[in-house]
Amino acid sequence: MNSLPPRPSLDVLPEALRPDLIRLLDDFESACARDGIALDHWPEALVRVWAGSGFAARIAIRRPNLLLELIQDGTLARPLEAGEMAARVSAVVQAAQDEAALMRDLRLLRQREMMRIAWRDLSGEAGLDETLGDLTDLAEHCIDQAAAWVHGQLVQRHGEPRDAEGRPQRLVVLGMGKLGGRELNFSSDVDLIFTYAARGETDGEKPLDNQQFFIRLGQRLIRLLDENTAEGFVFRVDMRLRPFGDAGPLVMDFDTLEGYYESHGREWERYALIKARVVAGDREAGRELMRALRPFVFRRYLDYGAFAALRDMKAMINREAARRSRGDDVKLGEGGIREVEFIGQAFQLIRAGRDPRLQLRGIRPVLRRLAEMELMPGYVVDQLITAYEFLRRTENHLQMAQDQQTHRLPESDEARLRLAFSMGHDDWEGFSRELARHRRRVQEHFQQVFAAPQGEAEEAAGAEGPGQAVLASIWAGDRSGERAQAVLAEAGFRDAPKALEWIEDLREGAACRSLTATGRERLDQLMPLLLGAAAGAEDPDTVLSRLVTLVRSIARRSVYLSLLVESPMALSQLVKLCDASPWIAQLLTRHPLLLDELLDPRSLYAPMDREGLSAELDEELSQVPEDDMEQMMDRLRQFQQVQMLKVAAADIMGVLPLMKVSDHLTWIAEVVLERVLSLVMAQLHARYGRPRCLIDGRPYEPGFAIIGYGKLGGLELGYGSDLDIVFLHDSAGEQQMTDGDKALDNSEFFARLGQRIVHVLGTYTGAGRLYEVDTRLRPSGASGLLVSSLKAFELYQETKAWTWEHQALVRARPVAGDAHIAEGFAEIRRRVLGICRDREKLRQEVREMREKMWSEHASRDPSRFNLKRDPGGIADIEFMVQYWVLAYACDHPPLLDYPDNIRILERLVVTGVLPEEDARFLTDTYREFRNRIHRLTLQESDAVVDAAEFAEQRETVRALWRRVMEEGKA
């Protein structure tokens, strides 16, 4: 009998666990004697490990040599190096002479590795990440290399499977759940889906069609891994997540698989695919498949229906847990692992289609990303991750005890003590208190995220009053017309018959009649809430009419109904904004994607500055493939709409003053123009190369710039403003050609660039239009070239431009593009506007232009006043300012410092051209008029008011006009 060193001390163990460990040590010593094994020392952690894992002890007793090997190779004391697990599995597979040998040796390898993993975990050497990673690696390499081995066996008999073009085909294995997320637990089964790229047949003497080939491969692979032999199993294989579950074929080709998810895919399958990952076989083909499935998993819109679907799934789990008395289930019970996963994955299902930063597999990276994106508070994420790690360690230790796939807390005192001891506690009570604390926090956060919809929550709490019930019955049509009208009148609707008519038209209309059962259910949940919210508005009737229009437009897209049902905040903000502005109501109706912005008032009423806008748009566009111009155009439109909504919301609530409103709207346009120019330029560079030329014999790369005129140039954009822009380039000299394979003359290149920019800005897509673009202020107007060279622009302004074109130049500035051209344009502008002019002739030309505008556009109704065009309005002020600049800039160059009217008026005072009193009056009046126009735009009204409203200001403006423009007095 081989001698063994003295037994290790059992002092670290609770008294109740020592007898069992003594028996295990007795059995191990007998096994060593039986197999002629000698240990020169007992591993220090053996007592702690065997106290927590009878499974690890039994393997060592059955095969002492496995423990000896692990001691000798040092892997009980160190983590595996990169590639080491793969090499261990490969050595077993390569040495296998036949299937029986492979089955045996894989199982022995599994015993050895599971003993090592349990040892390092229970001894405290390995953290959770290492344990989960090693378990995942073991499973993944066993699946991958076993699949390759079976493939080779089948090829010998039937030949290589090929598609119609003769390309070889391999099985693709998708790992689902915790395997896909690299979070496999100790005794987990592996959830797999088998697929392959294309139909065809094998090229051998006994050919099979590819479907049969891969079915046989899958069946043999499952047997290799799953069958329970004298040595146990490698991994239990669960194929129930495949399309149609147990009733479906074991293997599907890509087209059939994609077709299934497009036609039959359910919410829980989207949830399952979040973590899906190619774990074996043809990984490149598998990655292509995952890209194809991404739109099913991650919807491009914000999918708030995911809340309801996950809530239903969790309710089903809770019912099943209750039926099986699983209150002590750390995975499925309340406050358990599944609730943590649901929290993170709900945000993924809802948002990851729009924001690929959330397209992650592991739950902890997802939670951390949510904190980074400020979608969840940092302290909540910290609590969830801490709880998750504690629960996962508990789950692993439960399973390490006997290598059983259990998630339930033990019932016997001894088993409870073992678990508590393995988790670092001296007794069950201490462990139980810590567990309860973590589960309570998880449950609280879960309930906050998955709170029942507003109506359901009231009902569940017994708080639903008769008002809510009555409104629900009105929507359902359960009350007669008179009774329904009486209720609506009592609720606050002034024209109850009309309100009822709107409700009935919506209920009986085509949009609602064609709803799916899910859509109808969500609409039925929303409408009583919406009626109650509208009744509480300042103008219930107007709000209801606007909300009904919006609901009709979104009814077939139940995700938006879900958003309003799920979020009291979103519904509250919707009512507030629809009450305040039909323009905002129409914006939301046309672009319901914007409803997501209503969830967070902190963001909704806080428009970004220019730097923030630029960073935000860069982030948005970085998530789109560079060659997907269609999606780029949609993202640009969505960005612009979101930012304009924020400005309008802040404006309507009085958060932003007038000048800031125009600043923000102008910044949005500038940022959009910069990105559109950059995107289109890159597209044309890829196709034609970069423009080149020789100037004075030196190589030069010409640039391109966008010049903003009018309200864009003057930083005075309104909500409905179009963009007056002019395109310039600075190509000159010789050899003006692009350097690509499809070379173009530079003038043609820049013309195409300008055309493409106009197209991107002005084309309607499914996401709407960016801006209406007007390029008629370019040299020679609509008959001139779309894009001019800087030299040609300079020559035109100096020799051919009309006075009205110089007036327009007053409010012009570079807004995007090449800095060198911007400097050149600024110099041309200063020189042209600074020319000394005949003031009498200038005054006559400006006056004639103003009279022409008035005759063509002014109001003919003396009881009405067009704020923009009528005498005494904005146009008079702008024309006077332009006259003063053109008349006096020769003597006072500071008048050319700015392109906007307000700062020019300030300069007119500083230079002594205009009395301060007149400048102050014009400034205040100009702001009042513009502010009123903003208000009218948000009410979807023309810029026309009652003539009496601004009578005094209007008359004073006309008096100034007569004094300056007719009498020639300053």
Swiss-Prot record:
The record, for CDD domains, names: NT_GlnE_GlnD_like
Gene for this protein?
glnE
Query: What name does the UniProt record give this protein?
Result: Bifunctional glutamine synthetase adenylyltransferase/adenylyl-removing enzyme
Function field: Involved in the regulation of glutamine synthetase GlnA, a key enzyme in the process to assimilate ammonia. When cellular nitrogen levels are high, the C-terminal adenylyl transferase (AT) inactivates GlnA by covalent transfer of an adenylyl group from ATP to specific tyrosine residue of GlnA, thus reducing its activity. Conversely, when nitrogen levels are low, the N-terminal adenylyl removase (AR) activates GlnA by removing the adenylyl group by phosphorolysis, increasing its activity.
Could you tell me the Gene Ontology terms of the biological process aspect for this record?
regulation of glutamine family amino acid metabolic process
| Region of interest (Adenylyl removase), residue spans | 1-454
Keywords noted in UniProt: ATP-binding, Magnesium, Multifunctional enzyme, Nucleotide-binding, Nucleotidyltransferase, Transferase
Report the GO terms under cellular component: cytosol
Supply one GO molecular-function term.
Answer: [glutamine synthetase]-adenylyl-L-tyrosine phosphorylase activity
Q: Which Gene3D superfamilies match?
A: 1.20.120.1510, Beta Polymerase, domain 2, Nucleotidyltransferases domain 2
